Amino acid sequence: MTRRVIGCTVTTRHAIEHWSPRLSSNTAPPSNTAVSSNTAAPSNSAARLPAPRADLVVGPAALPVPGPGELLVRNRAVAVNPLDEVKQWTGDLMYRWLPYPSILGEDVAGEVAAVGPGVDRFAVGDRVVAYAVGMERGRRHDAEGGFQQYTVVREDLAAPIPPHLSAEQAVVLPLAVSTAATALFQRDHLALPHPSADPVATGRTVVIWGGATSVGSNAIQLAVASGHRVVATASPGNHARLRELGADVVVDYRGPSAVADVVAAVGGAEVAGILAVGTGSAEPCVAVAAATGARRVALASPSVSFGSLPRRAGLSLSFARTMTRLVGANLALQLAARRRGIRARYVWGATLMSNEVGPMLWRDHLPSALADGRHRCAPEPEVVGTGLGAVQCALYRLHAGVSARKLVVLL
């Protein structure tokens, strides 16, 4: 069947179903919501992935209840990420532990509808932006998924939205800023000093390849806030914007001398580390590390793109070729790095919820940095539509390719 969603034609291979809320202890509204005893409980709905490679289906959902250290957020905006697109497009290549139907989505912004036991940093009605981790192993997948009207989030992965920012602007942050912080500050990656409002200059440089991406835009700001000079790469049309975010020098990554240009921009300074963002960024970053003496490269993207894979079940020739290229590229990359004494490791943004980086970012840094404008919501949001039905349209747009923008759906 065919549905038109906010000017976007979405063809589904699965009939739209209406999902009945599960009758369990988690379906009742919590006692500390903004709903009084004389008011009907708010209803919830979600955009679910019903099966591998299927289109999202919108239907009723149980109203989640926040547990200790958690918030229930009434979402006003959600954003889509490559992880959502890859999960939908490739089936169980990633997130094999997720059951079907699944509620995807990591980026949410809205108002606090309820607080769980032990939460004193937020109150009902507060505007918040948060990183929803329902897709991660061991989490409550339905309750903590982002693509629904009400989402449970961890208090230590949420920050207040200051008055001068809208939910639409703030929602570009969660997964991107979390991934950037994981890459820059976790001990097993670049291990930089934590950001502050008055950073002390370290005299060192951080190289960020892919500065116009969502992760790169946040990494530039965090690296500057930790006292580092930043050399970034981007297409020429994005150079001015990256300088506004704090990059000292921006190089065209598509130029034939891009690696040499980055090395020249470093100018002999000590390189604290290199962050590679975007398909194809790993190899030039290892080359830059070898030329500058850097010893750590954080890899935020796979070596090959999954964009050309057909959206169908079974082993296809293109799938086999892609996986062969992926394995070969990773092996060659690691061998090249080790020969030069360089440690190149892949970044998984959600790991910050298990160490000090998560609370440092979401409790200590972002609230004040957003309030006084030291950290900007970047890249710019592009609203695809309104309502959960527009999430699928946003995923198709993302698959087609987006540059220096974050696709957002208003709820």
Predicted regions and their residues:
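Terminal helix/beta-alpha structural elements that buttress the NAD(P)+-binding lobe
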Residues: T2-N26, P42-G67, R74-A109, A114-V115, ...
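Long, intrinsically disordered low-complexity tandem-repeat segments
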Residues: N26-A40
